[in-house]
Amino acid sequence: IRKPKDYAVQEPGDIVQVDTLDLHPFPGVHFKHFTARDVVSRWDVIEAFSKASSRQAKAFLSCLIERTPFPVKAVQVDGGSEFMAEFEQACAEYGIRLFVLPPRSPKLNGRVERAHRTHLDEFYAVFAPEGDLESLNKNLRSWEWVYNNIRPHRALDNLTPKQYIEHYHPGLISSQSSHMY
């Protein structure tokens, strides 16, 4: 289902864009990097998997729900096969609306595409994965924490996503947020 034109995006969690990125740190090693970006607060959740299937996308959805300090109401994805079957079912079970973009329209998922660029430039440019998925995800989790809690964002008037939420949407911060990392 495409996002209705009148669907209002006003607070964190109204729409979270989700996408994958192919990583080839060196010959013979391949990872799928999943990124979720909240379009209002720029809060990111990132995780790497060995491949991108609907089972991994479902697992990533669980990571997203666990690591956001606000309820996720809707996710927006491209039409990739990883966002079908088990992922669609998981969205329905969690009560999360699923919006699927038309084919070949990455500009409509621009926030998460920009997030990929930031993670490539600021994380992967300085951290070289060794081929160990567990180690990569441990380091990605540390980077995610820095990104959401320490790194200022120009788009948020130099606030961090956490500061932005606390300042503009204080009622959304859930009690689980202190246990996220």
Give short role names for the model-derived ranges.
Residues 36, 111-120:
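A structural motif
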Residues 1-37, 56-59, 70, 177-181:
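Mobile-element integrase/transposase regions
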Residues 74-79, 93-111, 127-132:
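RNase H-like polynucleotidyl transferase catalytic core
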Residues 1-8, 12-14, 85, 94, ...:
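C-terminal domain-tail junction helix/linker
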Residues 20, 39, 51, 79, ...:
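Residues immediately flanking
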Residues 46-70, 74:
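Active-site beta-loop-alpha junctions of metal-dependent nucleic acid enzymes
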Residues 52, 70-85, 104, 157-162:
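Acidic/histidine-rich, metal-coordinating catalytic segments
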